[in-house]
């Protein structure tokens, strides 16, 4: 096995970049060529069917069977012209990935042959086995029926030879078994609530869109090195490994020159993404060695989420073509930054106004403050629930580790906005002349005046206002954005409804509309003041202060999930029509079960590696030292031999003590798992794994990492951090 390590290291050094030919056309020419977008709809659909489909997409109007058949026929024709032979309903089960089953475009022709067929009923609905996906007990094997149903708002696309049709996934009894269905409901809820509030300022607003711009961080590791690390292969992260002498302390990787092999991967990925209509815009080195980031232009939230899931699948596929494996785990390497997926979220109207962007008139700025304060109130009211939405066994390694936002939800606003809210809270005057941008003269030749945002950036804040949007930074790199987005949009929708009810009640008593709005805003600012924090979220002082403010400070992931079932959460979800108590209970069962299984797999892999690699390596090196000590005694007088071999004796004893501890702790961990596995309650089982198994794994790792420092490098079988992080 040690020979394998050195072979893959040598092979990785010798690999050349797989050059990607530059596309002859500009990106705008091939953008969306594999997407059944409105341009394709107009070309391939009858006029009446096109108009009805567009109306369904824009306004949610139902589609009749005749229109569905026409759409299916046009979609099939376009897809087959592009080389597609199969179709699939593409959905997002509660596994955090995607699912698909491919069927060919063929049916019997009644004459012993086949013909290509795709009817509206196949487009609209299919019946996957719901019991085979995480469902929290909603579906059993003996009652397995589930339905996938077409989502017309997200266009179909082609991957390889398959037409992929975005769908929701529900149980036979109607409960959602995916992320897309509740996300769509949350987006509709925030649309209705925001439109109602917008009418205070502009009665022409008919629709409000939630926008999402995600920033996908990831690591790339040479596939040979990846294959030689069973922990990476099985869990997505290194369960052991001492920090490299050099990691990110020189701060020389962030925004540095992109390595050649990596650049060719990025170019290949971008071309495929653009062909699939994903508007990728930014690529750069991240803070940690071999860590990178990809970000698109923001899009409507549902479509943006589909595109993020699609881009993660593309990254896994294309990285292998370039001899890499992409790591989307939140913390694949100890001691260097983990990976997140910042979710830039905003609301905008069909009249072209970003609701969280300052305006030019006092009325515009009152609208701006109205929506910002309502978002803050929603985040304050449901801060525990928002934390639950981004919590997982994998993200727990990253949050609060002085590299990512802490596991306490707070909001950074910046100096200017903070002063505006403070002024509004404490004074009777209403001056809303707030600048959107302010100039900065740098006094450097040939550098023009910069327009700077009216907020600074606070990297320690999990939910920061950044000029015209909020940046939810606590989302993990492997997560489905919908988990966080459905909670955020539903919470904001619920708060906007409450706000409107309070304002309307004051107007009904004869109070002026704007005076009523300001009065309710002032009250809400005072009530949600605890969520506002512009300081250092990494500090111990903030943890104590957050507890004093009544913010949720729980750090145990299984207990964090309890927030979904709080009375306030259930009321919010049910009143907005996003999810029922039964659906929430089922999802929590899935969350606890997934947490347990991920820790369970890691513990089993760690135990196997310990017994099959670590202890044999350590004892082999120990034996060579013992042999050396015996030879010293044969060669030198006793006193001199004892002196010359004293350091080796210390190492021999150190190895013995550590291997004994590791073996005993692994045995203890195995027994603890057996006991935990017998617990029937998924919640209690997850708590047992968190409280008992995780600390044992950390203790085992500590001693393994110490052994790595003393065991002969030629004997060590597993690629080390310096190889995993610095070979590109």
Regions found by a protein language model. Name each.
Residues 521-728:
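C-terminal amphipathic alpha-helical interaction region
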Residues 2-24, 141-157:
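N-terminal hydrophobic targeting/anchoring segments and the immediately downstream early-domain regions
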Residues 2, 7-12, 33-39, 98, ...:
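Eukaryotic, polar/proline-rich low-complexity intrinsically disordered regions
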Residues 96-112, 131, 229, 236-238, ...:
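Short linear, low-complexity motifs centered on an aromatic residue
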Residues 8-10, 19-35, 188, 192, ...:
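Flexible inter-domain linker/hinge segments
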Residues 143-328, 337-340, 347-589:
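Glycine-rich, acidic/polar active-site loops that bind/position phosphate-bearing ligands
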Residues 67-71, 91-93, 121-122, 169, ...:
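Active-site-proximal loop/turn and secondary-structure-junction residues that shape catalytic pockets
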Residues 30-143:
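Active-site core of metal-dependent hydrolases
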């Amino acid at each position: 096995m040690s020979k394998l390590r050195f072979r893959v290291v040598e092979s990785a050094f010798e690999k050349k970049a797989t050059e990607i030919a530059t596309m002859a056309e500009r990106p705008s020419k091939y953008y969306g060529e594999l997407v059944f977008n409105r341009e394709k709809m107009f070309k391939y659909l009858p006029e009446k069917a096109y108009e009805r489909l567009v109306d369904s997409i824009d306004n949610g109007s139902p589609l009749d069977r005749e229109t569905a058949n026409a759409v299916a026929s046009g979609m099939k024709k376009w897809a087959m012209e592009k080389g597609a032979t199969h179709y699939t309903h593409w959905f997002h089960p509660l596994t955090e990935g995607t699912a698909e089953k491919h069927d060919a475009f063929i049916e019997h022709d009644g004459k012993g042959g086949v013909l290509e067929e795709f009817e509206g009923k196949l487009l609209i609905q299919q019946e996957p086995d719901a019991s085979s996906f995480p469902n929290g007990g909603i579906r059993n094997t003996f009652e397995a029926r589930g339905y996938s149903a077409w989502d017309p708002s997200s266009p179909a696309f082609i991957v390889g030879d398959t037409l992929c049709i975005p769908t929701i996934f529900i149980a036979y009894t109607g409960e959602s078994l995916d992320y897309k269905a509740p996300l769509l409901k949350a987006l509709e809820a925030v649309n209705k609530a925001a439109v109602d509030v917008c009418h205070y300022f502009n009665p022409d607003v008919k629709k409000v869109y939630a926008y999402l711009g995600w920033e996908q961080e990831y690591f790339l590791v040479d596939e040979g090195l990846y294959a030689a690390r069973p922990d990476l292969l099985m869990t997505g992260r290194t369960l052991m490994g001492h920090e490299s002498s050099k990691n990110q302390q020189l701060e020389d990787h962030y925004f540095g020159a992109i390595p050649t092999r990596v650049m060719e991967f990025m170019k290949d990925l971008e071309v495929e993404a653009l062909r699939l209509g994903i508007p990728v815009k930014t690529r750069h080195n991240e803070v940690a060695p071999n860590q990178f980031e990809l970000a698109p232009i923001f899009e409507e939230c549902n479509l943006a989420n589909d595109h993020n899931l699609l881009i993660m699948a593309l990254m896994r596929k294309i990285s292998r073509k370039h001899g890499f494996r992409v790591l989307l785990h939140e913390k694949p390497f100890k001691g260097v930054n983990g990976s997140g997926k910042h979710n830039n979220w905003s609301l905008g109207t069909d009249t072209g106004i970003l609701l969280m962007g300052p305006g030019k008139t006092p009325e515009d700025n009152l609208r701006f403050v109205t929506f910002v304060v309502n978002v803050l109130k929603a985040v304050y009211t449901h801060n525990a629930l928002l934390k639950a939405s981004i919590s997982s066994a994998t993200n727990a390694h990253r949050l609060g580790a002085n590299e990512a936002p802490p596991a306490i939800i707070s909001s950074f606003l910046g100096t200017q906005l903070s002063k505006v809210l403070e002024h509004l809270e404490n004074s009777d005057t209403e001056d809303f002349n707030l600048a959107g941008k302010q100039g900065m003269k740098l006094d450097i030749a040939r550098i023009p005046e910069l327009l700077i945002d009216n907020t600074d950036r606070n990297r320690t804040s999990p939910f920061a206002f950044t000029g015209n949007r909020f940046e939810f930074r606590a989302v993990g790199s492997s997560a489905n954005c919908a988990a966080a987005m459905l909670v955020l949009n539903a919470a904001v929708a619920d708060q906007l409804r409450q706000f409107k009810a309070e304002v309307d009640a004051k107007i009904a008593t004869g109070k002026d509309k704007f005076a009523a709005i300001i009065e309710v805003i002032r009250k809400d600012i005072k009530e949600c003041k605890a969520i506002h924090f512009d300081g250092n979220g990494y500090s111990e002082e903030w943890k104590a202060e957050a507890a004093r403010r009544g913010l949720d400070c729980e750090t145990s992931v299984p207990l964090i999930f309890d927030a979904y079932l709080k009375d306030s959460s259930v009321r919010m979800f049910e009143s907005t029509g996003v999810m029922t108590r039964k659906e929430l209970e089922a999802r929590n069962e899935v969350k606890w079960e997934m947490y347990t299984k991920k820790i369970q797999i890691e513990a089993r892999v760690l135990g196997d590696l310990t017994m099959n690699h670590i202890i044999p390596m350590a004892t082999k090196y120990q034996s060579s030292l013992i042999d050396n000590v015996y030879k010293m005694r044969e060669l030198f007088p006793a006193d001199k031999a004892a002196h010359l071999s004293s350091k080796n004796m210390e190492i021999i004893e150190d190895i013995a003590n550590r291997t004994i501890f590791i073996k005993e702790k692994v045995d203890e961990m195995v027994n603890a798992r057996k006991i935990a596995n017998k617990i029937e309650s998924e919640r209690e089982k997850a708590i047992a794994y968190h409280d008992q198994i995780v600390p044992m794994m950390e203790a085992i790792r500590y001693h393994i990492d110490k052994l790595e420092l003393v065991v002969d490098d030629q004997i060590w079988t597993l690629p080390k951090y310096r190889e995993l992080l610095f070979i590109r």
